[in-house]
Amino acid sequence: SVGAGQVLHCPYDAQKAKIVVKEMLDLLTLDLVEKHLVTDQIVLTVGYDIENLADPEHRKKYRGEVKADRYGRLVPKHAHGTANLKKKTSSTSQIMEAVLELYDRIVDENLLIRRVYVTANRVVDEQTISEETEFTQMDLFTDYQAVAAEQKAEQEKREKERRLQEAMLSVKKKYGKNAVLKGTNLQEGATMQERNNQIGGHHA
């Protein structure tokens, strides 16, 4: 598996934490591309902050299960889920769409978030899937020309995205991790730019 986790420097609401998840997925998919790997399963774990139960205002909004953290403090039970993809890929857009849909489904938007983990499971070398051939059961009711045109358009879109991913990797290697930043990285709550300036979790 390939993955990453992040402990936020302060509690984030669900919308700000979603920005961090997007950043982590960007990095995860670039990591897959760099290693020539693909996945069809992403696991998302979101840990809530102790303030949710310590603060009376937040406490009365929560009706769910409570767990003790490793220090014995009570916190809402973490959100945990799996996004299964139709086929193995390293596409940022496909992985992002699946995981953000999962995020919206499992995360309690009333709770403050302190930890986020994303992991790509069932990872294999991309060469192994390029050698696989898909067989489709033929029937009389499918417009196979339309299906072929749709598949061709999807393939061209993926190839364009792949070239962009490889270009981003090349620029980051040559000029540093902050040489290419997306609009997401400049939003309030984004952490990638600051994390890129740190070595071993500390400012360089």
PLM-predicted stretches and their roles:
Residues 1-204:
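Basic, low-complexity intrinsically disordered segments
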